[in-house]
Regions:
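Short, surface-exposed acidic/glycine-rich loop or hinge patches that mediate macromolecular interfaces
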Residues: 15-16, 65
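Active-site nucleotide/adenylate-binding loops and adjacent lid/helix of ATP-dependent enzymes
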Residues: 11-13
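Short N-terminal binding/cap micro-motifs at the start of the first secondary-structure element
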Residues: 17-21
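Short, surface-exposed acidic-centric catalytic microdomains
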Residues: 23-65
Length: 123
């Protein structure tokens, strides 16, 4: 019996060595998801950050048989593998957030951000 595939939207963001870290994250997401599609990447100014470096942001839509909880754990593991730490110095090597799992939206504040509203149109 085939497992149910769930449609997901994941946001990618980085404010440190942005292009390299985003490329690493994309490679990992291509391995993780079935039919991964990526938007273009856009630069944004930091919001509520102690650092002034711009963020590179991108969205990804794909499908997975993983449950929601397991998918979130795997995303956090990918962040660690790329070099993310949870210190408070404002460096975000990579941030992978599950914005939507099937029809359930997460990170509701992010849905109001201009870059999400712009990039979601590319999916």
């Amino acid at each position: 019996m085939k497992q149910k595939e769930h449609t997901v939207i994941i946001s990618l963001a980085s404010n440190e060595n942005q292009e390299v870290n985003m490329a690493k994250a994309k490679e990992q997401l291509i391995q993780l998801l079935t039919e991964a599609h990526f938007t273009s990447a856009i630069w944004t100014d930091p919001v509520n950050s102690i650092r002034k470096e711009p963020y590179l942001n991108q969205l990804c839509r794909g499908t997975t048989a993983f449950g929601e909880g397991l998918l979130c754990e795997v995303l956090k593991e990918i962040e660690k593998r790329i070099g993310r730490t949870r210190n408070e110095d404002g460096i975000v090597v990579i941030d992978l957030d599950l914005l939507q799992y099937d029809n359930q939206r997460h990170h509701l504040r992010d849905w109001g951000r201009d870059y999400v509203n712009k990039l979601i149109q590319e999916l």
